[in-house]
């Protein structure tokens, strides 16, 4: 109901959700135009196996959302170390939200270099 009312007023609706099929379906039901997949568990995973399991979940959720006509974004805890795997494994993502890592690194290497490094990771 809220999503429908907001869209009638030309307000774009995007929901931050876990990469879960039920949550993707719910986003479509409330007429969100886009979702942002929570990459926090992927970013915090300590083993390669756990990271790979989270990548599979992200991939499935992104594909499902794309197939339902939702735009797909992702973010939370993304860094220059973990972004390349997202780029290579989850092609339906249109936008990554990475601000904290870029700003934090800029303290040590400068904003320009921090941004360049992230761009290089994304363009791999």
Give, region by region, the residue ranges found by the protein language model.
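Histidine/lysine/aspartate-rich catalytic loop segments that bind and position anionic ligands
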Residues: 2, 11-64
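Active-site-adjacent C-terminal substructures of enzyme catalytic domains
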Residues: 57, 63-71, 78, 82
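Glycine- and other small-residue-rich loops at beta-strand/loop junctions that grip anionic moieties
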Residues: 16, 54, 75-76, 107
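Well-formed, non-transmembrane alpha-helical positions, independent of function
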Residues: 5, 26, 64, 85-86, ...
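Structural preference for beta-strand elements that scaffold enzyme active sites
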Residues: 10-14, 33-36, 69-73, 77, ...
